[in-house]
């Protein structure tokens, strides 16, 4: 089953979010340290990141198989921040799912939501620092020097 899954992922994959590469490139060019905090298993995530040419943008990564508790537990975000030596209160987390927003907020980060399949409810929206429609909007946030907001 796993072999079939990996073959399908290699052939069809998943859609890359519009603006992903542009955002990662902008952040790297402007000195941001980037960590990946994904619930996906390491092999699967690396396969997709390499396929889309995004893997090398990240300075650190924590995968679902590296934590004992999944999102909304803050463990994955705390480890991701530690992997790039950034305190959570000085980090933003980009999320498309309510459980990820809860995880980032519990870790003490600034959660930024770009909704995908699941629209956030009121309880999740209270945890969100910023909400955007696309990853391109996050570039605008970085350009505006969000540290002063």
Please give the residue ranges for each predicted region:
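Asp-based, Mg2+/Mn2+-dependent phosphohydrolase catalytic module
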Residues: 25, 41-149
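Short, basic/glycine-rich phosphate-binding loops at helix/coil junctions
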Residues: 1-6
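Short, acidic loop-to-helix structural element flanking the phosphoryl-transfer center
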Residues: 7-36, 42-46
């Amino acid at each position: 089953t796993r072999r079939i899954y990996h073959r399908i992922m290699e052939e069809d994959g998943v859609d890359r979010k519009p603006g992903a590469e542009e955002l990662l490139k902008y952040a790297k060019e402007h000195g941001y340290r980037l960590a990946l905090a994904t619930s996906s298993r390491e092999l699967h995530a690396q396969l997709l990141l390499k396929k889309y040419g995004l893997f090398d943008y990240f300075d650190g990564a924590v995968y679902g198989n590296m934590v004992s508790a999944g999102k909304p537990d803050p463990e994955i975000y705390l480890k991701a921040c530690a992997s790039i030596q950034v305190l959570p209160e000085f980090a933003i987390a980009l999320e498309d799912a309510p459980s990820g927003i809860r995880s980032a907020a519990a870790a003490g980060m600034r959660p930024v939501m770009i909704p995908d399949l699941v629209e956030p409810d009121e309880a999740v929206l209270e945890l969100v620092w910023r909400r955007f429609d696309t990853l391109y909007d996050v570039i605008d946030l970085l350009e505006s020097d969000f540290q002063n907001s």
